[in-house]
From Swiss-Prot:
Keywords: Cell membrane, Membrane, Transmembrane, Transmembrane helix
Subcellular location: Cell membrane
Protein name listed in UniProt: UPF0344 protein GWCH70_0687
Annotated source species: Geobacillus sp. (strain WCH70)
Keyword Transmembrane helix attributed: yes
GO terms under cellular component: plasma membrane
Transmembrane feature ranges: 2-22, 32-52, 55-75, 97-117
Domain of life where this protein originates: Bacteria
Membrane-protein topology: Multi-pass membrane protein
Entry keyword annotation includes Transmembrane helix: yes
Record-stated family: Belongs to the UPF0344 family.
A Pfam family assignment: DUF1516
């Protein structure tokens, strides 16, 4: 399940940057990519929930990682909706960067992730 989750969030991040670039260029395909992105949000949340459920003794860090992961998805939506409305998205980008760094750090630090830290 770990590999499914990693694949899911990796595709989610790639689709997010594709959606951002399509949104900036004003392409008509941006809506289709955003719908695929939302589908991968669901895959990421489900696989993350299944991973969380499979842990025998849940540390508070796993709960924090899940919350930060949901925050990251929210920041992605804030960036995309702000761009669509033509608003300033600097705060949303800062939130996205902070959440992304935190979720990567927690994901690689905890025992279910890869041993980078």
């Amino acid at each position: 399940m770990t590999h499914a989750h990693i694949t899911s969030w990796l595709i989610t991040v790639i689709l997010f940057f594709i959606a951002v670039s399509l949104q900036r260029s004003g392409a008509s395909k941006a809506k289709i990519v955003q719908m695929a992105l939302r589908l991968f949000y669901i895959f990421t949340v489900i696989t993350g929930g299944l991973l969380l459920h499979s842990i025998a003794s849940i540390s508070i860090l796993y709960i924090i990682k899940a919350i930060v992961g949901l925050w990251l998805i929210g920041a992605m939506e804030m960036v995309l909706s702000g761009m669509k409305k033509g608003k300033n998205t600097n705060v949303a980008w800062i939130q996205w960067i902070v959440a992304f760094v935190l979720v990567l750090f927690l994901g690689f630090m905890l025992p279910l992730g890869f041993d980078l830290f």
